[in-house]
Amino acid sequence: MQMIPGDPFSISSSMGGFVHQETHLHHLQQQIPDLNPNSNPNPNAKPNSSSAKKKRNQPGTPDPDADVIALSPTTLMATNRFVCEICNKGFQRDQNLQLHRRGHNLPWKLKQRSKQEVIKKKVYICPIKTCVHHDASRALGDLTGIKKHYSRKHGEKKWKCEKCSKKYAVQSDWKAHAKTCGTREYKCDCGTLFSRKDSFITHRAFCDALTEEGARMSSLSNNNPVISTTNLNFGNESNVMNNPNLPHGFVHRGVHHPDINAAISQFGLGFGHDLSAMHAQGLSEMVQMASTGNHHLFPSSSSSLPDFSGHHQFQIPMTSTNPSLTLSSSSTSQQTSASLQHQTLKDSSFSPLFSSSSENKQNKPLSPMSATALLQKAAQMGSTRSNSSTAPSFFAGPTMTSSSATASPPPRSSSPMMIQQQLNNFNTNVLRENHNRAPPPLSGVSTSSVDNNPFQSNRSGLNPAQQMGLTRDFLGVSNEHHPHQTGRRPFLPQELARFAPLG
């Protein structure tokens, strides 16, 4: 076997036909360059594809060797710079005019440049002095560009889109917009759709700002739970009433609404009952009864209400010997009733002070009462007190109000007999002090409206002593059962003689 030394492809002479082919293939592989794109035999070589491209100057950065041309606005925007003297047809370029002159068999001449002539570029500046492109260093490169710039920035927008009402100063811009108007939609993250890109960009800026502000406020609320509670519970008094950590009688009174719901919440906490389920109709009936002169309805319905004699708004000097005086039905009486109704609602806000102070001593919450039960109890108490035909407790004199204003809150339970005896004591003192002098007239009060009060009977025909009727202490035993009451005495013989016709 003959071997070819140094040849890795050498084989035996029996395969001599293939040796020549393999040698020739190996020689060709060394001469043909590597066609693998991943391999780079010369890593220092740089691709010249980008350098072969001619870079275009950015707008506003002209060639410093270019000729700067300044045109007036009239010349710049003129549509017919070159006019034919035969047909008055205008052309924007002189070359077009020369070709047109050839049609009239006129001499024409086209500009021809010699090979030695150096072609210099021309740049155009904006005719507006305040424009940034008025400077030669910011000149625009061609005549068409300076015309469009002047029209867009300083010209009138003559073309208007019928779909979106957007106006354009350049007709080509208007045509390009008309092709795509309404075909594309820009959707914001908040779900709003826009057909115009500029409107979408403006909205997106505000929307992102609002989103960031909302995220910042939510982070502050999460870091400070007090702020979040304050922001989320405006006017929510149910949370305050149902909060077991707050003391009894605590009311959030940051905002007072004049509607009936605010009155229900105030009366509910003032009485010490849970009157959240009270119907508005029942409360309106109570307010209406109070406005017609039934002023003893509220003090007698619950002991948690403040004593009206202790508030100086209701201090009316009572020097008349006729204890059956009531508010008249005139316009003055209506104004007084309205003011008393408003003051009743206003003073009910002070009731938690009395209820909380008394409940510190007695931790016995009152049972809830419905509106119907409350009205029935008020009517029962009013009918019991109507036997005395006297004024309400807040018509007491200055001596009585001064003592009650500094006294402790009224007791929890007040029977009709105790109230009746207090009123009789007051009437006795009035009769004793003002027996020999005439009563001065009381403004806004008359005796002709006795029938207007459903809780009082008509006793206008009786004198003050006879109107006391059977409520006098004939036996003089009141001090035995009630030693804390003073000023009670039995009847004198001459006083008993006045009641003889009643028997």
UniProtKB/Swiss-Prot annotation:
Ribonucleoprotein as UniProt keyword: no
Comp. bias intervals (Low complexity): 32-51, 319-358, 396-407
Keywords, in A-Z order: Activator, DNA-binding, Metal-binding, Nucleus, Phosphoprotein, Repeat, Transcription, Transcription regulation, Zinc, Zinc-finger
Listed GO MF terms: DNA binding; DNA-binding transcription factor activity; protein homodimerization activity; sequence-specific DNA binding; zinc ion binding
Motif (Nuclear localization signal 1) on chain: 100-107
Pfam families (alphabetical): C2CH-3rd_BIRD-IDD, C2CH-4th_BIRD-IDD, C2H2-2nd_BIRD-IDD, zf-C2H2
Name assigned to this protein: Zinc finger protein JACKDAW
Misc. remarks from the entry: Early initiation of expression in ground tissue is SHR- and SCR-independent but later maintenance becomes dependent on both.
Tissue specificity: Expressed in the quiescent center, the ground tissue stem cells and to a lesser extent in mature cortex and endodermis cells.
Main subcellular location: nucleus
Compositional bias (Polar residues): 381-392, 444-465
Gene3D superfamilies, alphabetized: Classic Zinc Finger
Subunit structure: Interacts with SHR, SCR, MGP and itself. The heterodimer with SHR involves its zinc fingers. Interacts with SIEL. Binds to RGA and SCL3 competitively in the nucleus.
Locus of motif Nuclear localization signal 2: 146-153
Gene coding for it: JKD
Disruption phenotype: Ectopic divisions in the ground tissue (GT) region leading to an additional layer at the root pole of mature embryos and seedlings and associated with increased numbers of cells in the circumference within each root layer. Impaired SCR expression in the quiescent center (QC). A low level of SHR moves one extra layer outward from the endodermis, correlating with ectopic divisions in the cortex.
Modified residues (Phosphoserine): S72
